[in-house]
Amino acid sequence: GGQKSTVATMTEIYHFLRLLYVKLGTQYCPTCNVPVIKQSKDQIFASIMKTYKGKEITFLAPLVKNRKGFYKDLAVWARNKGYKHLIVDGEKVSTLRFPSLSRFTEHNIDLPTGTVKVTPENEGEIKQLVAVTLDFGKGILDIEQKGKKRTFSSTSNCPNCQKSFPELDPRLFSYNSKHG
């Protein structure tokens, strides 16, 4: 349109609607149909102690979720923090010999912060791993046990079924994205 045009097309407004849905929308659990709520570190810790009692689990901090890029700097950051491995697209990779990632391919990168057996003797270590992993994962941590992953979130958790959800992303509301 011209300089004085005030007509907006749906395509122009759509970007703002996606942001509006993410920032002001209320996320609901698809199973229970109730709004999801915030969960404290202590609640996440208690849930882990109950769910994985007697089992060996690995704490994973999701650093990159379905994003394009090289991420060499992430390997350097992890190495400087004392971590020797990252999980890149499901494969364990050394931070010393981090591969060249395709810039135009979406990647998932997780930081394994620790592996521990869930017992009362290890409560202190588990509490510390919960805090560190939530910090690195920006409020989200994954638990891996025998190849199965479960997400715990301090920002969106169902009060009924205790299922956690990742934070909303504008890409979820886009027909141009494979996530939406």
Where are these regions (language model features)?
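Conserved phosphate-binding elements of NTP-dependent enzyme cores
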Residues: 1-180
